[in-house]
């Protein structure tokens, strides 16, 4: 462990007590405002089509299914009823994706989603997304919500909205897949890792993952099934892995640094890149003693330096999904700009005891 100047530790503590906590408060207010408007919209969607029941609910002070991608960009995952007639398939699928196939062709008429099933028996993410997007547009008109919500004009294939003229919100239909785990497309857990414990791994696999009706990762372009495939999502697993105080605080610090310095034009970086590198850092440093106050600066700087390396190599492997590169769709020029910015922050944190006073 590197020596930590007292000024460095005090500066980080002040940063946490002021900027990190302020960000958390402001984010909560933002999500509350967004969900108030979106919740009203989803009531009208449900009135038009009862199969799309809103799952946007406040539970223990948090809205379920809401995910911040950046300070002004959010996803809302709307969980649908699968009716139990589909099998999960991740063989011969686009990287990071899976398919839902009728378990028995005779059950086609029993499915809640009959008209979205292809001739081959697959539940098409594209068809579900298209129908849902049409319903959202109609619900905005019927609910007279045009002053608060509008469909993004640069997007015609999903329910991406501009809310309160300030925030981008992508409404995504999805399914929960519990008590199963991807066998072919997933590279986690690694047999050599000592983190997390086997009991936590078992808990994560029991809880499962989600399938999102959104475009496949850029690496998947050109695959014939990409429109019908569902993107595999591990948000629930990430929350379990970041449950301990030190790791959770580290992520909050990284996101605060992002909001202040790394939310760059063209979005070369998003929160998902920080989450991914933090997960890799957790594998490198599995012991709880490596995530206490005295070691947190080492962890933060290690993640920043690893991010610089990924930006320079123009590759950021997904933590869970095999063959998925999170930088694949980013321009080289934007990644180079981001690398310089991250390097400046990493150098300041490593060499300047008062760095967090100015960050």
Predicted regions mapped to residue ranges:
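Terminal (often C-terminal) interaction modules
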Residues: 1-20, 33-53, 262-265, 285-359
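N-terminal regions immediately upstream of nucleotidyltransferase
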Residues: 1-74, 78-134, 138-141
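Catalytic cores of NTP-dependent nucleotidyl/adenyl transfer enzymes across multiple folds
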Residues: 66-67, 103-312
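Phenylalanine-focused residue identity feature
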Residues: 3-5, 15, 52, 74, ...
């Amino acid at each position: 462990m590197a020596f930590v100047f007292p000024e460095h530790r005090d500066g980080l503590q002040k940063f946490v007590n002021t900027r990190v906590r302020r960000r958390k408060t402001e984010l909560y207010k933002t999500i509350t405002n967004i969900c108030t408007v979106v919740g009203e919209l989803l009531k009208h969607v449900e009135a038009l089509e009862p199969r799309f029941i809103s799952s946007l609910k406040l539970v223990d002070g948090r809205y379920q299914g809401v995910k911040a991608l950046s300070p002004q960009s959010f996803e809302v995952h709307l969980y649908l009823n699968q009716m139990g007639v589909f099998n999960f398939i991740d063989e011969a699928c686009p990287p990071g994706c899976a398919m839902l196939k009728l378990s028995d062709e005779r059950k086609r008429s029993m499915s809640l989603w009959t008209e979205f099933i292809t001739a081959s028996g697959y539940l098409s993410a594209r068809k579900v997304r298209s129908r849902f997007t049409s319903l959202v547009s109609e619900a905005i008109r019927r609910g007279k919500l045009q002053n608060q919500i509008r469909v993004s004009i640069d997007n015609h294939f999903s329910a991406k909205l501009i809310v309160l003229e300030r925030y981008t919100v992508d409404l995504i239909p999805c399914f929960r897949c519990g008590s199963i785990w991807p066998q072919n497309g997933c590279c986690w857990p690694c047999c050599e890792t000592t983190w997390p414990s086997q009991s936590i791994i078992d808990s994560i696999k029991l809880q499962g993952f989600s399938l999102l009706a959104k475009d496949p990762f850029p690496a998947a372009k050109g695959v014939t099934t990409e429109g019908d495939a569902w993107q595999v999502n591990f948000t629930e697993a990430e929350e379990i892995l970041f449950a301990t105080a030190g790791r959770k605080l580290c992520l909050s610090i990284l996101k605060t640094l992002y909001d202040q310095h790394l939310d760059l034009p063209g979005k070369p970086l998003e929160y998902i890149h920080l989450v991914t590198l933090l997960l890799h850092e957790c594998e490198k440093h599995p012991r709880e003693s490596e995530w206490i106050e005295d070691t947190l600066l080492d962890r933060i700087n290690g993640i920043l330096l690893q991010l610089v390396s990924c930006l320079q190599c123009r590759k950021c492997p997904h933590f869970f999904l095999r063959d998925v590169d999170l930088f694949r769709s980013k321009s080289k020029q934007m990644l180079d700009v981001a690398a310089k910015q991250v390097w400046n922050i990493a150098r300041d944190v490593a060499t300047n005891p008062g760095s967090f006073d100015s960050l």
